[in-house]
Amino acid sequence: MEHQFTVPAIKQAYSDDFTRFGRPGVVGYWFEMDHPYEGHRNFADTNDIYLNTYNWRRILRPNTTVIDIGGHSGDTAVPMGAMTGGTVLTVECNPVVRPWLEFACQMNRHLAKYIVAHEAVTTEDNVMVTFSDHGNQMCNGGLVDHSWGIGAGNNSIQVPGVTLETLCRRYLTSEEINRIDLIKIDTEGHDCLILDSSREFIDSLRPTIIIEWFSSFDNAQAEAMFEIIASLDYVALYPKNFKFADATEPSEDLLLIHRSKLDDFLR
């Protein structure tokens, strides 16, 4: 069957063999954006960082569903699909970078079932929210909601927003929802607010969760983040070494494990 694709402007195309990560014969492809504010990244090195340094190869499990919120150019979605072979729902509300994500998912459809969603994931359904860049011509950015108190940069657009549960039910089958095993959230400081507003849905699945420790958080915001994590009955670990995380010792990301699954995870 013939397929036609729109090819975005690409600076460099890469392939990587995932045999060294325990997936013999699995080859994935990633395409570096030709954008003035996109720094150079080698695909193999990026995979090594995610899968080895951040231990994703110990977290991603075969034939599961992964939710990738903040998909950008596909640098996280591709290794997620390569390692699971299941379903990857990757979410990118920024229309400037989404063509690279869509192209990467099309070129890697032999790895997994990829679904690209265009909505922002927010704390309530059917809202319009502002996406603003970091002064980088929409290469990256985050949501601006003045009730959340976090802003971004120079260029802004309005994007539709839905809750995590609504997003999953909109794009996934019931079987795929039941197989959700990992949720990665990178929403520039709103990660725990999204979890807090989706606590019943999260508790029904109790997946592993990866969130960003937003670099602009002050001590009070970090404490509030840890309070939300604890209220969800999750435990925060540092992904590089699986040690218990502390609100006074920042990390780029946090790995969240439901308390009922912690002993099995650490065993």
Model-identified regions with their sequence ranges:
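Residue-level preference for nonpolar/small residues embedded in alpha-helices
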Residues: 97, 142-144, 221
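Hydrophobic packing residues within well-ordered alpha-helices of enzyme cores
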Residues: 80, 101, 131, 194-198
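S-adenosyl-L-methionine
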Residues: 1-168, 171-177, 238, ...
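Short internal loop-to-helix segment that lines adenine-nucleotide cofactor pockets
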Residues: 43-67, 125, 144-203, 217
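Conserved acidic-Pro-Pro-aromatic motif
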Residues: 86, 90, 167-267
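Residues that form or flank phosphate/diphosphate-binding pockets in enzymes
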Residues: 75, 99, 125-126, 193, ...
